[in-house]
Amino acid sequence: YRMILGEDPVLQVNLGRDVATAPWMLVCVPMGIAAALLGHGFVRGLLATRRWAKAVTALPAGLLPGLGGLACGLVGTLAYVWTGAFGQPEHGVFSIGYESLGAAFDAGLVWQAMAILLVGKVIAVLICYATGGSGGLFSPTLFIGGMLGGLFGIGLAGVDTLLPIFRDTTTAHIMGASVLLGMGALFAAVIRCPFTSLVIIFEMTRDYSLILPLMIGNMIAYYLAGRLQPVPLYNALLLQDGINLRRMPAYQGARDYRNLPVSTIMTYDVVAVDA
């Protein structure tokens, strides 16, 4: 990762090494709960949208991704226009969203812009992934979690002005820490890899100030998401495609290629187009 993109962090957090951990040990609890609920809704929506898209058989195979791309473009354009109405035009729905995340880390986004980006990104990802468009779920999940954390941060900053909780901490520090916790918690809830999100966030930010709150928030989100949706996302996607990993033959080392029937991995719904 660093050999390709360089040693500089992708996202600048600038929390400082003297950040107080104790208040964030409390904040990570509701953050983890909120991330679990949002992640559960996101996974359910993704599976439902994909199920609907697979049921659409009246359209040619190559037309559905095109319509999905058109819909994503419309959602991204609306998000850009609506965030611009608040003086902060953001194109985070179109791109990976590092610029918008960086602005959220620096307390540079109003809550309306973050709410628009969160909702717009969720809708765009559901449409794009369900219709067979390009792209994955890792970066969008981090982006959505960052916007969730940013909304938390604005609320915490407002509370801190009335009842000081964070000593010697600026609004930018509160926002940066909240965005960081939100990214990790939602990733753990959706992808079900709580420690992988720690590594990804550390690699992207080069900041290790909130290790314990991140771990606790991730584990809370991971546990609650598992209770709400026992089948992980990628397992559920395989089940939608008719692949059940539990029914595959047991691993037999070097003999696997001889004993594994082709029918366990082949697809019967072949899409063919005229050359």
What are these regions (language model features)?
Residues 1-275:
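Alpha-helical transmembrane segments and immediately membrane-proximal extracytoplasmic
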